Structures are given as C-alpha cells and as structure tokens.
Amino acid sequence: MLQRDAVIDVDESEIPPIPFVLAFNDLTYNVTLQQRFGLRFGHSPAKIKTLLNGITGEAKEGEILAILGASGAGKSTLIDALAGQIAEGSLKGTVTLNGEALQSRLLRVISAYVMQEDLLFPMLTVEETLMFAAEFRLPRSLSKSKKRNRVETLIDQLGLTTVKNTVIGDEGHRGVSGGERRRVSIGTDIIHDPIVLFLDEPTSGLDSTSAFMVVQVLKKIARSGSIVIMSIHQPSGRIMEFLDRVIVLSSGQIVFSDSPATLPLFFSEFGSPIPEKENIAEFTLDLIKDLEGSPEGTRGLVEFNRNWQHRKLRVSQEPHHNSSSLGEAINASISRGKLVSTSYRSIPSYVNPWWVETVILAKRYMINWTRTPELIGTRVFIVMMTGFLLATVYWKVDDSPRGVQERLSFFSFAMATMFYSCADGLPAFIQERYIFLRETAHNAYRRSSYVISHSLVTLPHLFALSIGFAATTFWFVGLNGGLAGFIYYLMIIFASFWSGCSFVTFVSGVIPNVMMSYMVTFGYLSYCLLFSGFYVNRDRIHLYWIWIHYISLLKYPYEAVLHNEFDDPSRCFVRGNQVFDNTIMEGVSETTKAKLLETMSGYLGMELTESTCLTTGSDLLKQHGIEQLDKWGCLWVTLAWGFFFRILFYFSLLLGSKNKRA
C-alpha cells in the first residue's frame, strides 16, 4: 500500500480503526411510463411505475452485501440509487455514510461503480490497462513508481499475476479468459482503493468457477477495508457462503434482508421450509416467482419480512457504537493505507490538468491502434487501390471537351470517395462509448481532453490515407499544376478526410446504434453529393433547396480541386475545331469544319480558326458557377467543417454522457 503522506496529511498518532457504515432508509423511486404509440387524450393520468418501494438497510465495511432478485426486481435500480446514479429529486429517501449525507463529488472519490459489461481496450495488456487507470484516477502528486507499486499490488490482489502481460483480447485476438477479463474490469475501477464498491452483476456471463473466483476477490477487497455492494442473479451455494448480508427484492420491495445463513430459518417460519441439499438462492427465487404469480403476490412475504426485522431489532438491541463521523473515518482509513486521493473537505474535479489527460489518452490510443496494423494497413490499401482504379480509368485525360467532362467526373467521384471511406470509422467510438461513459462518470478526464486526443491521434492516419490517394491519382490522371498543384491537391484531400472523419465521429457520438448511424451518414453524404455542384449547377438549384448546397460537405473540396485544375487562364480546353465535338457535326470532314468556322467568323465579327481558344479554365469555372470562393477559401472552409463537427462532437459527449437516471 502507498504511504499516507503521498495522499493526505493526518495526525501521526495512532488512529484506531473506525468502520464505515452505509445506511439507506425508505428509498423510493418512481418513473413515468412513456406512451410509445398514439396520443393521450383528455385528462387521463400518466402511468407511474414504482421501481423501488421503501427500501431500508445498511452495508458495513469488511462485508459483502448482495442484492438478489429475478430480472426486473429492481436490483440494478437499487445499485444505481446507492451509487448516486439517480438524479436528485427523483429519488426519495436518504443514503448516508457514517450518518452523513453523501455529496456527489465526494462519492466519486471514495467509491467505484463496476458496470455489468467488461469495457476494456482489447489490445492493451492487463498491466497497461491498470496502469492507465492509475494515471487517470490517482493523484498527480504520486510518483510513477508509487503508481506502479499500486498496480502491482492490485494485480496480485486480483489474482492476475500470471496474465499481467497478456492482452485483453477480443473476437479476433486471443487474450485473457472471461473471468480474468471481469477481474481486470473490476481492477480499473478500484485502482484508487475505494471505500465503497458497487458492482452490477459481476458474475453475469461467467462459468461457476470464474464466478466463484470473482467473488473470492471481492471478499478480499471487502476485508481490506471496503464496503462491497453487488447485485447478483442466482448465486451458487459456494458463492452464498462468501456473502455477509443479502437483500432479496421482488417488484422493488424487500422480501428478505439478513445474513444468508438465516434464510432456512426465515422460510421455515414463513411456512415454506427449504428442502435439504436444495440450492438456497434457487429455492428463494423460485418461491418468489410462484408468489408473484398468485393473486396476493408477495405482499405476505413482504409483511413477514418486516415483522422478522422488528423481532430481530428487539432481540439484538445493538446500537451502532462503532460508527463515527465521516471525516474521522476517512482520516483513519487513509492512515491505514487506503488510497483516497485527497482530503474529503477539498475535492478536485480532476486529478490531472487537461494537457496531461490529453497526452495519456493519446498514448493509450496509439498503443491500442499500433497493435492492430492490419486494420490501418487495410484501410490505406483500399484507398490506394481505389486511387489506382481511378487512375487506370481516367488515364492521362487530355484537354479536349471530352477530357473536361472526364476531369469533372473524376473529381466528383474522388471527393465522394474521401467522405464515404470515412464511414468505416463509425463503429470505433460506438465501441468505446461505454468505456468513455464509465471513465467520465468518475471524472477520470475531461470530455474536451478526450476530443482533443481523439482528433490528434487520427491526424497521422489521415495523412497516410491522403498521401496514398494523391500519389496514385495526380500524376497518372494527368492533373494540372505541377508540384505546387500536387501539394494543394494533397492538402484538399487531407482536409476532406479530416472533415469527413469529424462528421462521422460526431454522428457516432449522437447515435449509439451502428446501423442507424450508417443510415444517417450515407443519407446525408448522398444529399451532399447531389447538391455539390457536379450533378446540378448552383444557378439551377431552386431557392428552397439552395441551403443544402451551402451545407454540402462535398461542395467545397469539389470546387477546390476545380480551382486547382482550371484556374490557369492560359490553358485552353475548347479550340475552334473542338466546338463541334459531342454534336451531330463531329463526324464531318475537317474541310467542312473549317468552312463552318469561317462562316461563324462572319456572323460573330471575329476570326475563328482551328487553333482559336474558345473556352479557358476560367470560363469553365464561370460556367459551373464556381465564383464565390477561391481555392484557398474552399480549403479553409473544408478544414473549418472538420473543426465544427469536432465541437459538435464535444457537446454531444457533454449532453449524452450524463450517467444519472432522471
């Protein structure tokens, strides 16, 4: 354990152990059911559902309090209520620690909430995962060596020493087992050695052996000086032996609250004795299910439990003589080596400044990404293959009218490719979303730091994509501008990737469903392509649709590459004899064309020959209505779209990551 002087200054005199007691009294939580279809007419009242109804109990330091019940009984809701995950005003009743109401900022420091899902980066090792958790949660005043010592101690406590250098793994990469993964998930949340630990069904989805090992670890954590409160669906007999107290719920009400060892006596007095060699938890849940299906429901069992509790209180007559004020208990806990990060009277919102958070997040991203080179390499390969395909289709286009149309077609398809290829990043944040929610719930880092690091880490990847596409198309298609033109072409491709990926990132932050986010992304990009100016010129778009033209992400990069290609006024694209191309006169002899040009010269009052330039690049830009911004203005607007969507992404995280229930 770390020394206390690295965390908080306390009296050097011997401080006796003062146990923590988390008490909750008469917790009631109601929700208004939303009507999914139709409207509510007249003054019919909204339907109210009670999720918690008068829940009272306590949990003590060194003990495991388990909340049992069938699905929908209110287990997770009660965990959320105790963990401060329900908005103030919605929850009735009180939750106190050593007799003092818990403020949300203090609760973040002294507690941890382990979600049911194992939310971890797959390509980090066990040790790296816990070390990053230490960087986020432990005080910056602690040295790197002390943080590493804490990680080593925790790895040993969790029984993960043999796999500490093994990656977490996922569907495509072999890693730790399910039980080990669950213990790592617990470890990331208890890195700061919390006083109170909440867990939502930590044994869910595990085999009996793995589940037993998880509960063994939780027992060690409780004995180290923590209160452990967890929900569990149907524990085995071995697991029941590790539980100190059990609360059994049915429809949001307590039907039993005591030591699991008293369950046989409880049900025997209720009139439903537990058969010998029967799994106690299984019998309890089956009996409750039968009662819930009866006309009276579980009212009789709820009332019997109340009488049971009253008799127990009269017999025990045990006051809370060990309970102490919260401040004294925290100081005593710190003196014994608990890693509460600071004084309970002065709690910082974050342990690190924003720039340190940004560096840590960027480092974690880079490690995770560099261990999946096949993903990055595949995307670069696909973009380069697309560029190679376009280069072979539009190989060395000339300066004829037909060549102009081919250039326009190439630019439209190329710019669309930039944006559509960004859609493969949609699942990335959606997969990380719950990791982000878990970490920011305890103020591990700022949302702004996450957005900045996320943006910075993507830049090298986007630059590699840009180089790959530009190098395989510019010279082989025969685009204009030489080296300067290539550099600008590379810049606008990079800006397009930046803008497209920023848009996709924003969508993934707003819509947490992969299929829906794909639909929104491709739908919006299709409209952007339609109104970009290639299919319909700006002056042909009706006034009621012109706004789509100006918010089209493809408009500005498309106009930028046209500027880069056609801005040279000395370059000619339609000469005298080419005026007949793509018309019924295209097949006539050159002599006839010369006579026609001579006749047209007389009517127009100007000399027209085969070499007379009729349309320059500047004329083409005017014909397509590209006059409002120059090529640099188009580049800046494209880049600005990227920053705009990153800002929107930040606000989507700010508004969408409120973890409390209404």
Swiss-Prot record:
It is a multi-pass membrane protein. One of its GO terms (cellular component) is membrane. PANTHER family: ABC TRANSPORTER G FAMILY MEMBER 17-RELATED, ABC TRANSPORTER G FAMILY MEMBER 28. This is ABC transporter G family member 17. Residues 22-276 form the ABC transporter domain. It is found in: Membrane. The gene is ABCG17. The chain crosses the membrane at residues 375-395, 410-430, 451-471, 486-508, 514-536, 635-655. Its main location: membrane.
